Amino acid sequence: MPSQPNRELETFANPLPERDYTIRIRIPEFTCLCPKTGQPDFATLQLEYVPDQACVELKSLKLYIWSYRDQGAFHEAVTNQILDDLTAVCKPRFMRLTAEFNVRGGIYTTVAAEYRQPGWDAPKIVRLP
């Protein structure tokens, strides 16, 4: 049976919850509709997060992202909605979603939204000589 788009995000247990590490996911084929014109808007999404107890399952993420292809949404709203949905299920220590929309009317739009778990501070980056 072919997969169908849906909004049910799934997670799996973080294999190393005691460690801060970053997961980066690039989604080059995001599509939604312009709510003003009904024309498709295309974007590349860059998801970066530090998991706590759960990680997002990639097939469910793919189907979730696919569910936006026929939905009208402003760039700012859809970026923040996706971030809110992901943080609700994953409960990460930190998550950033950057949406780079393709040119529309000679204008490129990039929207970046972040979530940070209260009390969590990023570890210092080690700079080697």
From Swiss-Prot:
Localization of this protein: Cytoplasm
Keyword Iron: no
Coiled-coil region(s): none
Keywords from the UniProt entry: Cytoplasm, NADP, Oxidoreductase, Queuosine biosynthesis
GO molecular function terms noted in the UniProt entry: preQ1 synthase activity
Family according to the record: Belongs to the GTP cyclohydrolase I family. QueF type 1 subfamily.
Protein name: NADPH-dependent 7-cyano-7-deazaguanine reductase
Native source organism of the sequence: Nitrosococcus oceani (strain ATCC 19707 / BCRC 17464 / JCM 30415 / NCIMB 11848 / C-107)
